[in-house]
Amino acid sequence: MYAQQLELFELFNPNPIKTSRSQLTFVDLFAGIGGFRIPLEELGCKCLGYSEIDKKAIQTYRDNFIKDANSDEVYLGDITNLNQLPFPIDVLVGGVPCQPWSIAGKMQGLDDPRGKLWTDVFRVVTANRPKAFIFENVKGLTEPRNIESLKYIINNLTSSGYVVKYEVLNSYDFGLPQDRDRMFIVGIRNDLERCWGFTFPKPIEGAIKLYDVIPGIQRSNFRKQKFSPTVLFDGKIPGSRGRFQKLDELNDFFLFTDIRDGHTTIHSWDLIETTSREKLICQTIMKNRRKNIYGEKDGNPLQFKVLATLIPELKQTEIDNLVDKEILRSVDDKGYDFVNSKISSGINGISKIFLPHADAIATLTATGTRDFVATISIQCQEPLAYKETFIREIYQKKNFQPLTAQDYAKLQGFPEWFKIYENETTAKHQLGNAVSIPVVYHLAKALLENIL
């Protein structure tokens, strides 16, 4: 299984770049658990030192990379204390802390102390003048609200004497079944002959499914049924469709939430015994709670008197019954809203369940996930039957499993020899923070060809 994955993105069967000159060297900044180091070493580069301050990440890093043969490799400590390195280097790499621009963080940008670590990056680059660098961050840094911060970063690196380019790359395009967008900033020193020659790698050919990577789930060769947009969307295609949500197919995952609707959306009233009347009440609340007429928030509690205008002959006891079933809740004196009113929280601890034949799972994060993977596949049928079959055969029979830390490692492209941290939660945190190995492999390969 894993060999098939490696063959797909050509990792660990690489053709290391050969040079008659000395081996290219690099320093691993914000080293984490070594996501940059693995592909660079596979490409024939040598690590001279690493910088990291998280003690548990350092333990994982040392367990995997520091052996008798390189026991004298330099631990560089905290980047805030770095200036001139004790040796010349060819390449600087690092995943600069991304929380300041991450949706999962508070998006404070350069106002966040972690965002200010870029000034340490500028200082180390200027002091050491490597031939090139690769820095990784979240896609959020490229979005309009952060464009001034991005310009500031690019301008500082350019003024240090580098030709700088950036691009967002997705892990799926490089052989992993994970929908993970990350921005990479690449710079080549402007006195080098091929400083303008670098171009970002193109997506590799081939496709991979979750069942190719995650053990214990069913492989299938179901041919997906096609539908017209009129059938799927009643002629109104949503504007927020993701990359892996096709316009003529049912989704390969089911979303658990009470505040959105769709053919593959599971609501609490689908899972709890409810009458058709109760379902109607819930659907009415769901369709109206986001309307501006009822408040400025993106989702407002609705008072009984409002609901009574929307639902004929509504009785207070009907609302009370839904409160007793823990589908609705009373919000102070503002009215009624769903108990499960946040998409990120899901229902019963489940946000999404992906089918084994899905092209990609959602982005893995350091804060964990409420995403699960079904252990069996179901045939794509007409929309209502598809949802009913999922609830009956997968949800009710518990034919789904959480992602393990080992699953995280595989979904990030880490090799089987890699030793993950012994604590499951910590291991997931570390792997969710890491770069995807095959993305860096193909990116670094394209870069090294221009600095030899």
State each model region's role.
Residues 96-97, 130, 177, 415:
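Proline-centered helix-kink/hinge sites
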Residues 2-3, 8, 254-452:
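C-terminal target-recognition/interaction regions appended to catalytic cores
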Residues 65, 96, 142-145, 157-161, ...:
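A generic secondary-structure signal for well-formed alpha-helical elements
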Residues 82-89, 104-354:
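Class I S-adenosyl-L-methionine
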